Amino acid sequence: MQQLYDFYILHQRKYRENSLLVSVFTREFGKLSALIAINKKTTNLYQPLVKLRGQINLAKKADSLSKIYNIEFVESFYQKTYINLLSLQYINELIYLLLNYSHEEDVLFDKYDFILRNIDEANYRYLLRLFELELLNSLGQGIYVDSDIDGMSIQNDCNYIILPNGFRKDFSFAVNSISGSSLKKINQPLSSWSDDDLKAISRVTRVCVDYVLAGKQLKSRKLLVDYLNLKK
């Protein structure tokens, strides 16, 4: 019996009359490009934020596509508020743009699955930072907060300038510097983060994510920022 794999669709477009070309996120294979055969009854099933399960036949050549068959519906996460949907759209766009193809991503997949199940209006900012930090780890760009770029230990009572490759001790009291105590919270549970910690860590992940994006623009981030500005 063929094994079935859980997956989420990140992006899809029509490919010929009865097929979709999809980018999917899986635990076992990371991100994959694949073909899915469709009919009138199943077209609406293949959407982002829907957990699916199916048989995956991996592409045999680098220039060919994987195929997904015998697809089952598992669970939908569309019953969320608008801010949560924008947040999840942002996460999907990050995975779609940044994650490499065909690489096992069990930790990141489990974080993604956890966020889909648990995100709400009270915690979405925390969970977005959690995912950004895990994604950076998966990309080999994990944030190291034990020492600064000069090799000196991060001090709770000192301020630091954020750089894409680390942190530099700030002796000029710059407005955009952040405290060492907040930096160290990156390695601690979300429950230990204060509002000030969250703001500081958000600035750190913004710099690091922008660095790996290398100029790519996130449509979902703009939608999220515009929506939050309207609510002020």
Curated annotation (Swiss-Prot):
Its keywords, alphabetically, are: DNA damage, DNA recombination, DNA repair
Keyword DNA repair in annotation: yes
Say if the entry is tagged with keyword DNA damage: yes
Cellular component GO terms, alphabetical? bacterial nucleoid
Question: What GO terms in the biological process aspect are recorded for it?
Answer: DNA recombination; double-strand break repair
Which superkingdom heads the taxonomic lineage of this protein's source? Bacteria
UniProt cross-references to Pfam families, sorted A to Z: RecO_C, RecO_N
The entry's function note states: Involved in DNA repair and RecF pathway recombination.
Q: Which HAMAP family match?
A: RecO
**NCBIfam families (alphabetical):** reco
**What family name appears in the similarity comment?**
Belongs to the RecO family.
Q: What is this protein called in UniProt?
A: DNA repair protein RecO
Which source organism? Francisella tularensis subsp. novicida (strain U112)
Give me the gene this protein comes from. Answer: recO
